Design a protein with these regions (language model features):
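Gram-negative bacterial Sec-dependent N-terminal signal peptides
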Residues: 6-7
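Intrinsically disordered, low-complexity Ser/Thr/Pro-rich tracts
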Residues: 2-3, 218
Length: 221
């Protein structure tokens, strides 16, 4: 009888230890699935953004995936233009952000632009384009009689345009925020900023051969 009782107790305890204690996620609120007609209508609406008030966002920190607040999939469908303040996501290092970004672009029609703060003098940024401080001090702020733009304008402009062509995104977001005295005196400020936008406008923007590519300027003086 004692042996039988011990055998029963052993079986009971073995049953408890064999229970699956791994935590399992519960899908308490499944994501709502919209129809293809919904997305087609959404893209058609996004195409009218030049005719109405629009929704523009700067977005960064999308190297995180634990919260929808840090993911492209978490952005509202109503966003017309997303400025990639966190940079262009690497498809190898950050495949989720890359995938969701392009799903947002292609499925929802949300346009993607690359932002940059326009400061060529700050931290000797001009040196990245093979220019010297003397170049910035002495080069003209206007087009020469032959229609040639100054070197700083061409080199910096082409550097920014490269992202548009290489990544296949929708344009540039230029943040005009000249802060240092050097930037205001020798950098891209005032008439030089006007010239810079004019140069870029030959390639992207409403007066260019690529009017679907956006040339956005925001900031302060």
């Amino acid at each position: 009888k004692t042996i039988t009782t011990l055998a029963v107790l052993f079986a009971v305890f073995a049953g408890f230890t064999a229970c699956d204690t791994d935590a399992e996620p519960l899908n308490l609120q499944p994501a709502y699935k919209y129809s293809e007609e919904y997305y087609a209508n959404l893209r058609a609406y996004k195409d009218t953004f030049k005719e109405r008030s629009l929704c523009f966002v700067w977005f960064s920190d999308y190297d995180q995936s634990y919260s929808m607040a840090y993911r492209f999939a978490g952005l509202p469908d109503s966003v017309d233009i997303c400025s990639l303040w966190g940079g262009y996501p690497d498809p190898v290092k950050n495949p989720l952000a890359y995938k969701e970004m392009w799903e947002m672009r292609n499925k929802k029609g949300t346009r993607l632009v690359m932002p940059t703060i326009i400061r060529i003098m700050e931290n000797d940024n001009f040196a990245n384009f093979g220019l010297t401080r003397e170049d910035m001090v002495n080069q003209t702020t206007t087009i020469d009689p032959d229609g040639i733009y100054p070197d700083w304008c061409v080199l910096y402009g082409n550097h920014l345009l490269k992202d548009v062509w290489e990544y296949g995104i929708d344009g540039l977001d230029l943040d005009y925020e000249p802060e240092s005295s050097d930037e205001r005196t020798y950098g891209i400020y005032g008439s030089r900023m006007t010239l810079f936008v004019q140069y870029l406008g030959q390639f992207i923007g409403p007066m260019s051969p690529n009017p679907e590519k956006l040339l956005i300027v925001d900031g302060h003086t």
